Amino acid sequence: MRIHIVNPSDMSFGVGVITPRWLYVLAGCTPAKYGDPIIVDETLEQIDPATIQQGDIVGIGIHTGNALRGLALGRMAWERGAWVIYGGIHATLFPDEPRDLGAAHAVVKGDGDHVWPEVIADCVAGRLK
């Protein structure tokens, strides 16, 4: 089981334009017993779907500008058997969208760093709240 933390984007520039801080905040909140998370900022490089395996956890942060790409990533991860967790301002304001359109197992509303370790533990236990 691996943990992927993804900032979705339709376009990759190959250089960091504005890398979101939340990627590293959640990485820092990931308990060490689960290993280092795989951080993917798609403004730098698109995610390789082959890296997502059954049982992995995929955290996707969306805002309105990248929501469609994020929802597509969630569906792809779900089809590969991964746990799909959404967060970010768009998911907070419109939590039904990731559930209805993005194959979400769960949506974190508000600051994710407070609940991220619990979300991971719930996925590992096979029982999300």
Where does each model-flagged region fall?
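Glycine-rich beta-alpha loop elements in corrinoid/cobalamin-binding modules
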Residues: 26-129
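Nucleotide-activated donor-dependent transferases that construct or modify glycoconjugates
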Residues: 2-14, 57
